[in-house]
């Protein structure tokens, strides 16, 4: 029954918009809705001092600094993200993107999304490490690190060149598999929620990293923002095993060991 209801809803959606509109404008609006609704809470928590005991860093951004981030994000999203969605549609269509019924079986959806997460994490890790080389950091990646004390919305605050560079890691999986638009939307939503959580600046008892062994999360990524760029490590986007395999989490692990020994948070 749930499947038939979803099919009916999808049929109504595809009957109201063209596939081009769904893959571009509607995708953009879905991204903006999920991104800002999931990212605003940590901004408000920081601004009004809520859940202070769960805040990873004691420092906070000023309201004007937060507002600056939001305004630039809107500019970047409209001037970079939306045009990229429009221009990449023919390529996705060529690679097999479809929006028609039937919707893919749940096993196909799950397997594809898991593949996207693993592939994105691998590509992002190496791309992110490259961005921490001296020249690229100075001219590109330093924009993202303007917020040494991150909050959810800073997850997508970056130089336009970085948006395109690391954005490749997000779209290469779907481009390879030619997914159904429904799967693409689910992947986008989950990826947005993941990166917003990783940049939230808060580590709660219910944070995903407390339950998912290989998941990095907010504490893992917050360390990356608060130390010198040449020593930050923790380059992967979602999981921890890439940093563990290549030894780029050693400083973080040492810091956590000292923190646990002293019984206090860094």
From Swiss-Prot:
It is an enzyme of class 4 (lyase). The chain crosses the membrane at residues 25-45, 74-94, 106-126, 163-183. It is found in: Endoplasmic reticulum membrane. It catalyses: a long-chain fatty aldehyde + 2 NADPH + O2 + H(+) = a long-chain alkane + formate + 2 NADP(+) + H2O. The keyword NADP applies. InterPro entries: Fatty_acid_hydroxylase (IPR006694), Sterol_Desaturase_Related (IPR050307). This is Very-long-chain aldehyde decarbonylase GL1-11.
